[in-house]
Amino acid sequence: RLLTVTGVQTCALPIYALDARWKTLQREAHPDKFSAQGTAAQRVAMQWSVRINEAYQRLKDPLRRAAYLCEIAGAPIDAENNTAMPAEFLMQQMQWREALDDATTIDSLEALHQEVMQARASALDQCQQLIDVTHDFGQAAQQVRALMFVERFMKDIEARLDQFDVT
C-alpha cells in the first residue's frame, strides 16, 4: 500500500507523496489506536508499524525501490550470483578506478565524485524509464546491478575524501 501512493506502482515516485502516504499509514497502524482492543491488537499494530517503516526505508531510496519493483515483476536482482556486466560499463569502472588511484587532491576527488554522481543520476533515470515506460524489468534489473557497483564506488570516493583534513 505504501508504494501505490499515486494509485500505481511506479519507480518515479515523488518523495513528498511517499512521505505523506507513510505518515497516513503510520497513523492508521499506530498501536495506541488499538489500546481499547487489548494487547494482542496492539502487538499486531506494532508489527504493522514496523513493516510500514521498513517499506518506507526501502522505497525512499531510488535504487532500492527499483530493485524491489524488478523483484516483484519477476526479475530478481541476484547481485551475488549475476555479476555479468556489459564491456562498456566495465571499461568505465576501470577508468574511474584508475582516476581514483591517481587522485591526489581534494579537487581531483571532488571532480571524480561529481562525474560519478552525474552518471548515477543518468543511470537512475534510465532505470526509471525501463521500469515505468517500457516495462523491461530484465534490463532494469541489469541496470540496478550496475548501479550497485556505482554506489559502492561512490563510497570509495567518499572514504578517500574523508582522509583529507578539511579543517
Where are these regions (language model features)?
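Short, solvent-exposed segments of well-ordered alpha helices
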Residues: 16, 39-43, 47, 80-83, ...
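Accessory regions outside conserved functional cores
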Residues: 95-167
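Conserved, surface-exposed functional patches that form binding/active-site neighborhoods
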Residues: 64-114, 118
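Proline-aspartate-enriched helix->loop->beta-strand connector
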Residues: 30-32, 38
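J-domain helical core
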Residues: 14-29, 43-67
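Generic detector of short, aliphatic-rich beta-strand segments that form the cores of beta-sheets
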Residues: 11-13, 150
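Single conserved hydrophobic/aromatic residue that forms the stacking wall/gate
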Residues: 1-11
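Short alpha-helix boundary/capping elements
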Residues: 30, 60, 64, 76, ...
